[in-house]
Amino acid sequence: MDILTYRQSPSEQERSKSLASLISAQGDTCLDIGARDGFFAMQMTDRFSTVTALDLEKPKILHPNIECVKGDVTDLQFADNSFDFVLCVEVLEHIKESLLENACNEIARVTRNAVVIGVPYRQDIRLARTTCVTCGGINPPWGHVNSFDEKRLISLFKDLHVERIEYVGTCKDVTNWLSTKLYDYSGNPFGTYAQEESCIHCGYSLLPPTSRSIFQRIASIIANTLNHLQQSIMRPRPIWIHILFTKVSELEKI
């Protein structure tokens, strides 16, 4: 799915509306981590004098009040308290477990006042996995190597204060250990091969399997049936969680 189609989807518009309601702050400086096409960075130019748009590859956003920067959330090249506000959405789920705490510490370090974090909520990252045809490695959907709930996010930003939590969308997207094994055996034919993210093991692009045996096809049918049965009795859960954090001053910590 191209980025324009993604932005225009009803679920994405609902998510964007929630995030906009949390970005109520105004000030001089703002940092958008994982800026991509600049969708949120452009919106924040109405509230901040300067918006820094950061991504792993330098964003190409043409706006007089947006400064595009190539950078890594695990090693932000900014001084402490550099920004009045920091936005970080669709980022933390991609960060390796070993670097996740450091990334969150960096976000908290560079903000002066507030942070908004947006991630998938309790995502079952066993569902819709992919199998790399190059190396045979199994990948999580959309390159999401982490799953989050309120407790985990709050613990990762333990030095910040929770101001507000919002939940967006509903789904029943879950699987089970048996379906997972069957899908893996069948080559994960229904995985997220349309994703931009490459294989987390070898770095090559992910391509769907070109051929499967009759046994693999049967395995995927059984896995699908088990998933549908499971999802029919599951309670819906939110798709996204958004949290507005504020920075606690040193005096308030005492």
Residue ranges of model-derived segments:
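Conserved catalytic loop of SAM-dependent methyltransferase domains
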Residues: R164-T210
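Conserved class I S-adenosyl-L-methionine
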Residues: V116-P140, H144
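A SAM-dependent methyltransferase catalytic signature shared across enzymes that methylate proteins
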Residues: E150-G169
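Short aromatic-enriched loop/helix-cap "lid" or pocket-rim segments at secondary-structure transitions
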Residues: P64-I66, R126-T131, T175-K181
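Conserved N-terminal segment of class I S-adenosyl-L-methionine
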Residues: M1-D80, L87, E101-C104, V133, ...
